[in-house]
Amino acid sequence: MYKAVDMVTDEPGTATLTFKGESGAEKTLTVQTVSGPAVWQGQHNTEKSIRAFAKSCFQFAIDNKQDLWFSAKDTISKVYDGEFKRIFDEEYEQNYKASFEALGITYFYTLIDDAVARVIRSKGGFIWALKNYDGDVMSDMISTAFGSLAMMTSVLVSPDGTTEFEAAHGTVTRHYYKHLKGEETS
C-alpha cells in the first residue's frame, strides 16, 4: 500500500486497471464508473515479496517457538488478500508444517475481524502476521490497549534473518521533546 499511486478526479468517468506483459499480452479491468469527483488508488505486491514475508514470519515463529496467526480480508479483497492467504498456506504446507508440529506450535489463518476479537481477548504469546498497513494500525492499537505506544518496539526481519529494531511510529521524537521540557513521559 505504501508504494501505491493515488489520483483525485473531478469529473464523471471510468477508471481502468491495465497490465501490459513483456510478452505483449494485455489485461484490462474496469475499476469503477463514477458520476462525479472521486479518489483512486492503485497498489501491487510481487509474489516474491509476499513469499519472503511468509518465510520470515514462519521462521520467526519457529525461532521463538510461538504460534503464528495470519489474517487478512480475503472475503472482500478476494484476489489481493487471497493471494497472501494462498502463499502463506502453500509455504506452511510445503516448508514449515513439520517443524511447527515438532515444536508443538500452530499456524492458522483467520479473517482480520475475527483475529481482532481473538487478540483482544487473548493473553498474547503468539505472533500475529499482518500486511503492512494492517500491521501498522493493529500494532498501535494493541500497544496502546495493553501498555503504551512509547514502550513498543518494531522488529523488521528479512528472509535471510537480518533483523532491524526501531522505535514505534513517532514516539521517540514526541517523548524526547517532553523530556526536554521536564514533562513526564510514559
What are these regions (language model features)?
Residues 1-26, 133-137:
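N-terminal glycine-rich phosphate/adenylate-binding segment common to multiple enzyme folds
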Residues 2-5, 79-84, 119-122, 139-143:
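Short acidic, glycine/serine/threonine-rich loops at helix termini
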Residues 119-186:
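Glycine-rich phosphate/nucleotide-binding loop
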Residues 3-12, 84-91, 145-155:
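A glycine- and small-aliphatic-rich helix-loop capping segment at beta-alpha/alpha-beta transitions
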Residues 9, 32, 61-62, 98-102, ...:
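Solvent-exposed alpha-helices and their adjacent loops that cap or buttress functional pockets
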Residues 1, 15-17, 67-69, 105-108, ...:
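Structural motif
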Residues 17-23, 27-110:
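Glycine-rich phosphate/diphosphate-binding loop of Rossmann-like nucleotide-binding domains
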Residues 113:
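Active-site loops and adjacent core secondary-structure elements that bind or stabilize anionic groups
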